[in-house]
Amino acid sequence: MPYAIVLSFDDESSLPIYQIFNKYEDKKIGSMFYDPKMKPHITLNTYEKINTESAKERLTLFSIENKSFKIQISSIGYFPVEKSVIFLNPKASNELLVIQQKVSSLFKDFEAGTSPLTWIPHCTLGMYIQKEDITQAIDIIKEEIVITEEKPFYIQTTSISFVKFERDPLKIDWWLDYQFKG
C-alpha cells in the first residue's frame, strides 16, 4: 500500500478547495476527492514501501525544524492524460522547492515515486475528468478562486503530513499531520 508525504493547508486556504470538491461531486465531474479523509494538499513525494515508525520520527523532527510558509497559486492546470487531472499550479518559490528537496533527502533511503528533477508541484482538484467536462470544471474553479495579478490567491501551509492510501479507487487509510513549529 503506498504512502505520501504532503504539504497541508490552513482552514482558510482549504475552504474554497473543499467547495470545488463538493461541486465536482454534486455535478458528477471526475472522481477523486470523495473520501472524507482527503484534505487539500501538495504532494511532495510518494513511496510504495516505507518504514512507518521511522517516517513518523523523521517527520516529527522535520516539523520542528521547518516553518509554515505561503504558496502563491499562479494558474489552473490540466494534465491531459488517461486519468485527466485538473489542478492549481503554484508559483515555483524557493521555499516550496527547498522543502521538496529536504523531504527527498530525508527519505533518500526509500524508493521515491518522483525525483526532485521531475517533480511537478500541484494541488489536485479532480481526476478522471472527461474531456467534455473540462470547461465546466474550470468554471467551477473560477467561481471559488480568483487568480489575478492584482489579487493573487495564496495558500498557507500549516503542516507536513504522512498519508497511507490505496489507489484506484483512491481511499485514504490514515492521514497524520505534523504542524510546523520552526
Task: Report residues per predicted region.
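Structural motif corresponding to the early beta-alpha repeats
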Residues: K37, V81-K83
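Solvent-exposed, flexible loop/coil residues
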Residues: N51, I73-S75, K83
